[in-house]
């Protein structure tokens, strides 16, 4: 064994549930993981439910698997916490039983958002100024939907919390929340790091369902005998307040001080900038969330489906390349990057149309497409198209970062790049060239769960603070310096792409094509 003390983080992600065990030096010891799906509710367009009964059973198995793989006694786990996708909520009755749950991008409340904007035309901007959130993925429209469509559940609702909080409720029986994830509900003060129940009251919703708030790294209870029997964790193990996946992931990457910048490249890409104030964007283009570090807010741009688009491209169009990669014994993405590396900057003029830059107040995207393809197979090869997708994700990230830098006044010469996309050497170099900034790749596989272990360690006195341990344990793998000539070329590509994207949005507006995704109420 590496140490006698261990910490366990539950990670309720978009695509899977996980339980990850770390030692006190931040070394990953084991992981239990199962994929899950968040399915639409029959007859409810754009819904994405959270099946808390099924998903709790999955998490039970993940915890048992992680403990078994670690080869340790459950009593060696000195604290347990949880993180999750953000925006998702769970509602409870007066006895603490779950009533209703939705996952992060549930967009069922289309009519309700339109109603709120009509009846309270200034409320969204007013609420954004206080919370950093719009109605796009907010809790209030979802509660209004429940009130109008499932009144029997709404009347029974006595409490709510976020999905990461829910996992801790299952362990401890305590219904509580914390700023980083509750902050994504849109009913939470950036400045005061507390609920804003008056928002709910203003639009005619219950204002007494918001639970106590504790900062990340606070012990809120202990593992109950029931939860112990279900999970294999020792009864009495401290249950520690965790946080939202992106903010705890930032801690796991060492992005914990004002002015630091990160890009997280997963299914969605997030562009994150730490700032020392609760400032919001006058243009309402960018969301702002509480960090897990008190005193820091995090401006966040979001690029939709960058990772998912890559998977679609691989699976739908690259069967031959996947077969060749398998024959060579390498990852298919690595082989596609090899092909893309032979293509010049700008990908022979190919313009991918997928995610727009972020416009949080009017958040929607054009129909997916590739523009400006050539019928010359050498110019529009699979490698060229793949490179165009990598360049496009970097360009949209750059545009979001520019928006953030403009309203925050923050500037930085470097970007911490993490997530699956950061494994690609070409993609990392493209991000450096597009942004004109040094790109640093940390040595960490499970940054979000690692951030959770920091919270556990603070709670039991192993570490003095999340920020301090994050800085002491972060290690760097690689760094990429920008090429100034490529930077200039990418500025031209970005301008062409913006004009092309505007034209594609007009087709959506005219009903000719279908938006890849749009927020409720648009």
What is each of the regions a protein language model found here?
Residues 43-47, 99-103, 288-300, 385, ...:
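Short beta-alpha connecting loops at secondary-structure transitions
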Residues 10-15, 83-85, 243-244, 264-268, ...:
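A short acidic Gly-Thr/Ser loop motif
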Residues 114, 248-252, 303-305, 311-314, ...:
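Glycine-rich phosphate-binding/hydrolytic loop that grips phosphoryl groups
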Residues 156, 319-323, 461-522:
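Acidic, glycine/GT-rich loop-and beta-edge segments that sit at the periphery of enzyme/chaperone cores
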Residues 46, 61-328, 516-517:
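Glycine-rich phosphate-binding/catalytic subdomain of phosphoryl-transfer
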Residues 1-101, 156, 228-229, 233-238, ...:
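N-terminal glycine/serine-rich phosphate-binding loop of ATP-dependent small-molecule kinases
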Residues 344-441:
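Activation-segment/catalytic-loop signature of the eukaryotic protein kinase fold
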Residues 18-20, 173, 330-369, 520:
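Conserved ATP-utilizing enzyme core subdomain
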